Each structure stands twice: as structure tokens, then as C-alpha cells.
Amino acid sequence: MPPGVDCPMEFWTKEENQSVVVDFLLPTGVYLNFPVSRNANLSTIKQLLWHRAQYEPLFHMLSGPEAYVFTCINQTAEQQELEDEQRRLCDVQPFLPVLRLVAREGDRVKKLINSQISLLIGKGLHEFDSLCDPEVNDFRAKMCQFCEEAAARRQQLGWEAWLQYSFPLQLEPSAQTWGPGTLRLPNRALLVNVKFEGSEESFTFQVSTKDVPLALMACALRKKATVFRQPLVEQPEDYTLQVNGRHEYLYGSYPLCQFQYICSCLHSGLTPHLTMVHSSSILAMRDEQSNPAPQVQKPRAKPPPIPAKKPSSVSLWSLEQPFRIELIQGSKVNADERMKLVVQAGLFHGNEMLCKTVSSSEVSVCSEPVWKQRLEFDINICDLPRMARLCFALYAVIEKAKKARSTKKKSKKADCPIAWANLMLFDYKDQLKTGERCLYMWPSVPDEKGELLNPTGTVRSNPNTDSAAALLICLPEVAPHPVYYPALEKILELGRHSECVHVTEEEQLQLREILERRGSGELYEHEKDLVWKLRHEVQEHFPEALARLLLVTKWNKHEDVAQMLYLLCSWPELPVLSALELLDFSFPDCHVGSFAIKSLRKLTDDELFQYLLQLVQVLKYESYLDCELTKFLLDRALANRKIGHFLFWHLRSEMHVPSVALRFGLILEAYCRGSTHHMKVLMKQGEALSKLKALNDFVKLSSQKTPKPQTKELMHLCMRQEAYLEALSHLQSPLDPSTLLAEVCVEQCTFMDSKMKPLWIMYSNEEAGSGGSVGIIFKNGDDLRQDMLTLQMIQLMDVLWKQEGLDLRMTPYGCLPTGDRTGLIEVVLRSDTIANIQLNKSNMAATAAFNKDALLNWLKSKNPGEALDRAIEEFTLSCAGYCVATYVLGIGDRHSDNIMIRESGQLFHIDFGHFLGNFKTKFGINRERVPFILTYDFVHVIQQGKTNNSEKFERFRGYCERAYTILRRHGLLFLHLFALMRAAGLPELSCSKDIQYLKDSLALGKTEEEALKHFRVKFNEALRESWKTKVNWLAHNVSKDNRQ
């Protein structure tokens, strides 16, 4: 066989009409070689191969084509079975153009699903098998059964319940949405256009915004009966309403004005277009989308119960000797030979150190340093908590200077962290680990606190075993039989014997003062002792202070742990806010976690969706694969497809991170097994994203040597290929699964001028009528996680304001990371940047920033006549909302290119690269000189172009103050959500200082009156100092003339 030519990924993205010569190896040993279209799918290629093979020797020895499957070597140098024969060759992207045909083995349906899951989650399922890890295998079996049972239950749902699963309602946050200054009026007449499924005839008639969908459908049926002169026999209860051109339905006992789609139509002055869909169509959809029957075998019988622990096991609590380990040696250690190597070890329960850390002796640097040293900890084995983790840090120290003046502090500064690793002391079945363990370590990242140990890091070994530094340790055999942590009944038995204490009135007052103290700073030792002593009082009178009590519990004393867990059994259920706090890393105990999840079960789907990002991040804190949070998220995702969609993408976007790839991959596998139809929808999105990445790489390369117009032409040429058009058309938007990305409008697609050349992709959808234009921005090379978090918080603020009847016309556009520095951003149509508006109304970039009339004139041109008053009101409300939001979140780097205005008048901010007060500096000087952006041209619009329209301005100030006051009332919610997001590892959200910014901006240590006074000072400062913003904008305009 001639030597093959390797095919890098770029090779497969060339024009489709080019064919590629492929080498084929048949099971009979026959070799064939002929050209095929890179655009052909594997099924077509197999037919071509069969046609040619019949003229070759030994053809009679072959079975039918369906008995064989192609294999290839993929781009990661692995052999891959290509079970899905609808995939195109250019999408398979084999490393060499060589396809080998092998006999199929095993269950084809099962293998096809496994192959599709592997492709979708970005990790081969065979990698999970090859780990031979009992915890992984048990988790997979348990979750597979859990998810398949959920799928079977879903298949039995009635049409209305199935509709709720597949197309959850999209409602405004509350019925009281008629906020001050908004233009919606209660009980307003509304014209709607309704057609019946399968018919092109449509009817337009008037209903009230207070009517429920059932009333609208009854009107439509009466109208149809009148027009066609037929008797009225059909019942409205047998129908539901679909929004035309969208995967969105209106149903339930909600007034029409509470549906987001109807609200958007009211605001934009458009007529809602709806389709009446019969229940039989919904049931047909359900049956078509049901999971295939369990593969061949009968419904799985429940596994036999785990045998009870044999009497030959030993209870941990019976072992009173100190805990010790042996440090044997290291390997693959890379450090300066002039230094010495040291290992530090510590025992942690969450953030709490259980005893003093211990350090090894110093040894000379070499690749395989040897210690053979016993490390003893100041804690008895019986006092080790169930979730204790052993943390190691390997670091180098410069040999101590010979000068007598050298101080300990100086020598500590010379510590050079190399790597860290963590290990749970108990396995997932509660057994104390023993024997030799090789810990593959993670490279250390310098920490501003100078901490060497990393207790919040993963307990998984670094999978990069070829190059990672490693430590070989030995956990001693402490008893003749396996040692187990006591079962819950034994713990409760010990905890029951807690003595009752007499509480004085003075102690009760002290307790109240400690627990009601603003801010949750560190308590003094005597305060901790008092809270613990009065724990029954805390349970009875301050149950929401459970977190405080858990933090003062001595987790290195098994009697106290037993008493705390006994108390937890009868603790009243917590409100959601307090339960969220318990998911933080500071509370690792599994019983505490289960209690928190029990309290979170009351979350509505909309509330869960609002906090989903944080809940996914705190999965990183979990010590074992099987935990209540994972089951809770899977359970809810399999009962609501929108939650399933976003759970999938939040997990999938981090599959490139080695420390979470195993956990996230296993959860993704379980979700896919519980929703095989949704898996196909997600695969379509994955294919589109793959094509967009290839397109973006091509554009980046081309734009280096070719002017933009020619590069744009080449981009369009590439997009017109059949493989691209097919992949990029007719898919649900990853940003919002109810949005259908129908036909890609190649001529309207372009790329932006910024460094990473983001793609601007436009879609049209005829069915959706005038609202059918949709745009997405594909970014490749930028981390969108901080933008997503900021937009999530702005959306949460919008919800909280609307619940109080204040609609500030915010625009929290969609933003979703989908992979390693890749993601999508929603295009807000009919909008422009302030920079462009100012530059287009000025002759010079230098004077543009000082043109106070530019914004108002632009709004006048877009909103003639009476529409201008409405546009100015929209501007006023949204400007108030973003002033408060950007101040509270400390959003920096604000200039005229990242503040935009919609033609309707709504102002909004984009690009959130800096937040929580991490402002840009230049030459050490802070460039952000104002609390938020409130320039004179904004005030000019708010005052309708009049210089002394103080009434309008005071109304604007009132909106700001009311918005700020509402956010303060929910201050703890923001603190908890940001605290949970520390698990994400964002550079600007890594320590308590970043959270402190929020406490300060919301003035959480002050009374409401003091806080409002504080905000007024900031408001006046923003107004007074707005000339500085103008100077910044002038500099920005001059350095980057934005005129297109």
C-alpha cells in the first residue's frame, strides 16, 4: 500500500466539489483505492465500495454491507468505529484518508447510541470503560437506570404534561408587570392573527390582554365556524397555541399579557401570529420523540441490595491512635537543581484545617526524589470526619543563605510552588483507604495569599500521567479488617446523647446579636463556643442561621459531628436563599448537601433556570461522583427540556478542562441516555458549531493576506457548500431552544473587525413573519464565561424589578460559551453603538463625543411623530436600569463602543470584560473615574432636549433609587450566587475581596436610609464628573474612528 498523506482538519474544510482519494481495506484482505467526494456520507461511500468490490477476488466470502462498519484513525490518533453512516466524510475528518471495513459486533442500536454520545460530549465512552474504576462503573450503571426510568415515565405523559416538558412556558416574572412609566395598559384590546394547523387560512380578531389562551382559542373556533358556516363542534380544550415559526406554545391559566411573546408584540406594536395545534399532533410528536425501547433485553431488574457490612469490619470510632501516612518518593519533578524539595501535607474538611499541616524534610532536587518519611498528624483516626481530604503541595525552597541576618520570613518568600494533589481519605463506599497510592499532581498556579495547599481543588488525579509530577504515598493498615465510617444510625445514636444546657437571658441576647450581625465575618472563639452551646436555640429560633452553626462545629471531634447531624435530622426546611449558601465548599458534609437539596426541591423551573449556572459550577466541589446535586439536576433536566438544554451546554462547554472532564462527561452521558431524541437536536447544534469554528479559522487565516471584501466573498463561497448549508440551517438556537434558526442568509453574513474575527451569522424564518430575522455572533478565541455571568445577573435584576412592578426595559441578550474559548452571542437587531451614532452625526472624531444632540436626533429619525415620546421613555427607563446594574456589579471599561441603543429607544451595555471593580488602569492610574455612565447627552434625551425639564430628570432619578433599593433587599442572593461562582475560576472572581465589592456597592452594612444617601452621593458624582467620561470617549473615538 502506498504511504498515506495525513489530512489536517483544514484539509476537510476545503470546497466540497473536490474529491479525495481514499484507501479502503476489506475484511478479506483486499485493498481498493478510488476517489470519493469529501461531501459524501458513509452510507453512500459504502455502496460505491460494494459496487467495486464485487469485481474483486473473494467477494463471495463477504456478508451483506450491513454486516460491516467502517473504522478510521481520527484526529486524536485513536481508532474509531463509524457507526453513524449518515455522517459525511468531511465531518468525520479521518487523520489519513484510509477506511477499514470490519465485521460488526454486538448490539448495533446500542453501539450507534454510544457512538453518537461520544461524538456529542467530546469524549469517547470507551475512555470511561478503560479506567476500570469501580466508582465510575457503579455511577454509570446507577445513572443509566435512573435516566432510562425517567424517560419511560415521560413516555406515559398526557399531551398537556408532555407539552410542559418539551416547551416550558415563557412568562414574564409576575402578573403585576404594569410598572411605572411602562406603556402597557391593563385590560388592553389586542389584535391577534390565528391560523389552524395544516391550513393557510388565518383569522384576525380582537381579544383582551387579560384573556387566557383558552378564551382566545374559543374565539378562534367560533370565528372559524362563522366564516365557514359550520356548526361549532370542536372544543378549545383539545387545542393549544403555537407561536408561528418558533418552538414556543401558549397554554395554562395565565393572562395573555403575561406571556413573553405577547409582551414583546405589545412593545414593538406587532400583531401576534399564532397557530392552533390539535392535541393529537402533540401526542404524535411525543410518540415520535420517545426513547427507543431498552436495547433488546427486558426491563432491567433492580440490582440485588448491597450486602450488609460483615462483622469483620472495624468502626473508625474505635481507633484512637494518631493518623499518619508514609511519604515514599516523587517522580517527574522539574525544579532548579540549586533548590531543595519539600512536601507539605494538610487535612481539611471544606476550607477548615482539621489540624496543623506537616512538612517533609528537605531533599535535593532530582527527577525522582526519595523521602521514605513518616508524616504524623495531630488528630486521632476516630476523629476524622467522613469528608476529610488529604491535601499535598510539592514545592522547592532556595537553600538558606549563610548570612546570619537571613530571616525566616525571607526564606519563606523563596518558596516556589511546583504542584498539588488532593485525596479523599474514604472511598465512595465509606471505607478508609489503605495501601500505596500514586498521586499524579496538578501544576501550581501562584496564589496571591501565598497558600501552597489547594483544598478546593479536585480530588481526581491529573489524567496527564505521562508528564505530571507524582507522589507515591502509603496509607497504613490501621486495623486487621477494613475500616468503615459509622453508618448514619450509629451517628444518630451517639448524637442523641447531647446534654441539655440552661440558657440565660443574657446569652440569648448575645446569640441574637451574633446571628443578626450584618456581614458574615469571622467570629471570635468565645462567640463560636456560645453559638455551639446554644445550638438548640439556633434550631428553634434562628433556623436560617444553620450555615453559621455548621461553621462553628468542630468537625475534628466526632462527638460534636454526631450531635450536629442528629440536630440536622429535625431541622426545619430552609428558604431557597439559605439553602443555596449550603452548597458552598465550606459545607462538604454529604448530609448537609442532601438537606440543602431537599430545601431546593421547592424551586420552580424558572427559578432553577435562573440559578442553573451556579449549581453546575458547584458540582466541581463535590468529592464523589454520586451526589444529591447531580441527581437533582438530572431529575429536573429530564422533566424540563429547556433546563436539559442549558445543563447540557454548561457542562459541554467545560469538557476541555481535565479536572472536570470525567464528572461532566458522565453526567452528560446519563442525560443523553435519558433523552435520546433531544440528543439528536443537540447533535445538530454541535455540527453547526463545528462548521462555524472551521469557518472562523478559515476567515482568520484568509484575512491576514486578503482585504475584507475578498475574504467576505470567500466566506460566502465556503458557506454555500452543501455540507455547510445543511449543517447551519434548520436547527434550534443553542442560545434559546425556542428560537428556530431556519434558513441561513449567506449574503447578510459577515465577520467583525476585532482580533478574533467573530462571525456575524444571519437567519430568516418565513413562518415567523416580521419577527423572523435572527442573528448570532460566533466567537472563537474569547472566554465568554464572565459575560454570561454578568448577563445572568442583569437578567436576575430585571426579574426582581418586575416582581416589584418596575419594568426598566432591560436587554439581557443571550450569551453562551459552548467550548474552549468559543461561544455564541445573540445579535440585538436594529441597534447601534453610541460611538457610531455620534460619529455619523459629526464631521470629526474629536468633536463627536461632545455632540449632545446626536443621540436625540438619531432617536427622532427612527421614531417620527408621537413615537418619539415612547422612545424617550424607553431610553429613560433602560438608562436607569443600566446605571444601577453597572454600578452594583462594578462593570468597568465603559466607552461609547460598548454602550448601544435600539431604534425603539432602549439603551443597553455589551462586552463585560471587567467587573466587581476590577477597572482598567493606564500608567497605574484608574481609567474609570465615575461610579456609572450618566453623560450630559443622556440627560439631554431624558429631558426631551429641554435644558430645564427637571420633572423628567427627577422621575429618572426616582427610577434609579427605587431600582437600587429593590436590589439591596435581595443583596444576600447576589452575594451567595457570586460566592458559588468562585468555583468557575474566573480571574476577576477568585477571592473574598471581589465579593466585598458587592457588599460595598449595595451598602449591605447600612440601613436603607443610609444606603440611599450613599447611592445619592454616587449618583451626583456620576453627573458632576460626566465630563471626564466625555474626555475618555473623545480619546476612544480619536484612537479608533468607528465610521463603517
From Swiss-Prot:
Q: Which GO cellular component terms are attached?
A: cytoplasm; cytosol; phosphatidylinositol 3-kinase complex; phosphatidylinositol 3-kinase complex, class IA; plasma membrane
Could you tell me what reaction this enzyme catalyses? a 1,2-diacyl-sn-glycero-3-phospho-(1D-myo-inositol-4,5-bisphosphate) + ATP = a 1,2-diacyl-sn-glycero-3-phospho-(1D-myo-inositol-3,4,5-trisphosphate) + ADP + H(+); a 1,2-diacyl-sn-glycero-3-phospho-(1D-myo-inositol) + ATP = a 1,2-diacyl-sn-glycero-3-phospho-(1D-myo-inositol-3-phosphate) + ADP + H(+); 1-octadecanoyl-2-(5Z,8Z,11Z,14Z)-eicosatetraenoyl-sn-glycero-3-phospho-1D-myo-inositol 4,5-bisphosphate + ATP = 1-octadecanoyl-2-(5Z,8Z,11Z,14Z-eicosatetraenoyl)-sn-glycero-3-phospho-(1D-myo-inositol 3,4,5-triphosphate) + ADP + H(+)
Domain named C2 PI3K-type is located at 319-476
Q: In which tissues is it expressed?
A: In humans, the highest levels of expression are seen in peripheral blood mononuclear cells, spleen, and thymus, and low levels of expression in testes, uterus, colon, and small intestine but not in other tissues examined including prostate, heart, brain, and liver. Isoform 2 is expressed in normal thymus, lung and spleen tissues, and is detected at low levels in normal lysates from colon and ovarian biopsies, at elevated levels in lysates from colorectal tumors and is abundantly expressed in some ovarian tumors (at protein level). Both isoform 1 and isoform 2 are widely expressed.
Please outline how this chain is modified post-translation: Autophosphorylation on Ser-1039 results in the almost complete inactivation of the lipid kinase activity.
Which spans are transmembrane here?
none
Give its E.C. classification number: 2.7.1.137, 2.7.1.153
Q: Name a GO molecular-function annotation.
A: 1-phosphatidylinositol-4,5-bisphosphate 3-kinase activity
Domain PIK helical intervals: 497-674
Per UniProt, residues of the PI3K-RBD domain are 187-278
Which UniProt keywords are given for this protein, alphabetically ordered?
Answer: Adaptive immunity, ATP-binding, Chemotaxis, Cytoplasm, Differentiation, Disease variant, Immunity, Inflammatory response, Innate immunity, Kinase, Lipid metabolism, Nucleotide-binding, Phosphoprotein, Transferase
Residue ranges for the region (G-loop) are: 751-757
Outline what the protein does: Phosphoinositide-3-kinase (PI3K) phosphorylates phosphatidylinositol (PI) and its phosphorylated derivatives at position 3 of the inositol ring to produce 3-phosphoinositides. Uses ATP and PtdIns(4,5)P2 (phosphatidylinositol 4,5-bisphosphate) to generate phosphatidylinositol 3,4,5-trisphosphate (PIP3). PIP3 plays a key role by recruiting PH domain-containing proteins to the membrane, including AKT1 and PDPK1, activating signaling cascades involved in cell growth, survival, proliferation, motility and morphology. Mediates immune responses.
Q: How does it assemble?
A: Heterodimer of a catalytic subunit PIK3CD and a p85 regulatory subunit (PIK3R1, PIK3R2 or PIK3R3). Interacts with ERAS. Interacts with HRAS.
Query: What protein does this entry describe?
Result: Phosphatidylinositol 4,5-bisphosphate 3-kinase catalytic subunit delta isoform
